[in-house]
Regions:
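N-terminal binding-site loop/beta-alpha segment at the start of enzyme catalytic domains
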Residues: 1-73, 190, 278, 284
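CE4/NodB-like, metal-dependent polysaccharide N-deacetylase domain
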Residues: 7, 89-109, 126-130, 182
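Acidic-and-aromatic substrate-binding clefts and catalytic sites of carbohydrate-active enzymes
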Residues: 22-26, 46-54, 82-87, 113-117, ...
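Short, acidic/polar
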Residues: 23-36, 85-100, 144-146, 168-169
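A structural motif
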Residues: 40, 102-105, 133, 157
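Short, well-ordered amphipathic alpha-helices
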Residues: 53-64, 93-97, 124, 146, ...
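A short, structured active-site edge motif that brings together acidic residues
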Residues: 69-83, 106-113, 140
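Beta/alpha (TIM)-barrel catalytic core signal, keyed to glycine-rich beta->alpha loops juxtaposed to Asp/Glu
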Residues: 112-284
Length: 284
C-alpha cells in the first residue's frame, strides 16, 4: 500500500475503505472484515453514520484473529455538527472511541463547517497533544474556512475530506490545500453513480485501453493526483476490483481527457447554501 505523509509526519494510506450509508450493522461489520482481508488498511467512518460499533467490532476481530497489528491500521471518524464545541467535542470523542473500541484514533475530522468549529478544534488540539489522536482535520470545508482555522489556531488541519470525482475535480481547492500542507481526501469518488458515470465514454475508453473498469480508472486518476480516496462497497469482489489500481498508470493524454470532464459543480449540494446549512445543522 502506498502512503502519503501528513503535515505532522503521520503516514496515511492513499487508498481506503468508506462505510457511508452502510446502516445494517451486521453487513457493515462483514464489509469491513472483507475489506481488511482484501488489503485495505484505512477505514473511514463517522458518528453520523451510526456504524462506528460495527467498524470497531470488525477491527477488533481482525486484530485478534488475522495477525494484523494496531499500527497496521488507520482509522478515521468524524465529529457531527450537533457535537461541535469544546466540551461537547470531548464528550463526542469519548463516545466514538468507546464505540470503536480504540485507545488512540488515527484521524479525527470535523464533519461539517458549521456550529462552534473553533471550540471543537481547541478540544481536538488538546486530544492531539495528549496523543489520543494522531492527526486532526476537517471535512467539507471551503478554502476560506480552512484558512480561518489555520490563522486562529496552533495546529493546522492535516486533512480536508471533500467531494471529488471526474465531474467535480477540485483543481483550485487542491492547489490551495497543497500550498497550505493540507492533504485532500476524496469522498464519493464515483459521484454515487450520478451522470451515468460508469458508462461515460471517455472513462470507458481509457479503461478499455488498460484492461480496467471505469471505477479503476477513476481511482487511479485520483491516486496519481496524490489524493487519498475512500471508495465504498459491501461486495467483496468490488472491493477487490477497487483495490487493483496499483498495477497501471494513466499517461498525460488520459489525465487530460479526464480533466476535460470537470463541471466545477457539486453533484450533491452546495455547503454554502443556507437551506443546506439549516438542514445539516439541525440533523441529529
Amino acid at each position: 500500500m502506498k502512503h502519503v505523509v501528513l503535515n505532522n509526519g503521520v503516514k496515511m494510506p492513499l487508498l481506503g475503505f468508506g462505510v457511508f450509508q452502510v446502516t445494517d450493522l451486521a453487513e457493515c461489520e462483514r464489509a469491513v472484515e472483507d475489506a481488511l482481508r482484501v488489503g485495505y488498511r484505512l477505514i473511514d467512518t463517522a458518528a453520523s453514520y451510526r456504524n462506528e460499533a460495527a467498524v470497531g467490532a470488525a477491527v477488533g476481530n481482525a486484530l485478534r484473529n488475522s495477525g494484523l497489528a494496531r499500527g497496521d491500521l488507520f482509522i478515521t471518524t468524524k465529529l457531527w455538527v450537533a457535537d461541535a464545541g469544546y466540551e461537547k467535542t470531548k464528550e463526542a470523542f469519548d463516545r466514538s472511541m468507546k464505540q470503536l473500541g480504540l485507545d488512540v484514533l488515527d484521524l479525527y475530522l470535523i464533519h461539517q463547517p458549521y456550529g462552534d468549529v473553533h471550540g471543537a478544534w481547541r478540544a481536538m488540539q488538546e486530544l492531539h497533544r495528549e496523543r489520543r489522536i494522531r492527526a486532526i482535520g476537517v471535512s467539507n470545508f471551503h478554502p476560506d474556512r480552512v484558512m480561518d482555522l489555520i490563522v486562529f489556531n496552533e495546529v493546522a488541519p492535516a486533512v480536508n475530506q471533500l467531494e471529488a470525482h471526474p465531474f467535480h475535480q477540485r483543481l483550485a481547492t487542491h492547489a490551495f490545500l497543497q500550498e497550505q500542507g493540507v492533504q485532500l481526501e476524496a469522498w464519493a469518488p464515483f459521484a454515487e453513480g450520478k451522470h451515468d458515470i460508469f458508462h461515460n465514454p471517455v472513462l470507458a475508453a481509457i479503461g478499455a485501453s488498460h484492461g480496467k473498469t471505469v471505477a479503476q480508472v477513476i481511482l487511479r486518476w485520483l491516486l496519481q493526483r496524490g489524493i487519498v480516496v475512500i471508495p465504498k462497497s459491501v461486495r467483496k469482489e468490488r472491493m477487490e476490483e477497487n483495490f487493483a489500481v496499483f498495477d497501471f498508470e494513466l499517461d498525460e493524454a488520459a489525465m487530460g481527457e479526464i480533466a476535460a470532464l470537470d463541471t466545477r459543480t457539486s453533484s450533491f449540494f452546495d455547503h454554502r447554501d443556507p437551506a443546506i446549512v439549516k438542514w445539516l445543522g439541525t440533523r441529529r
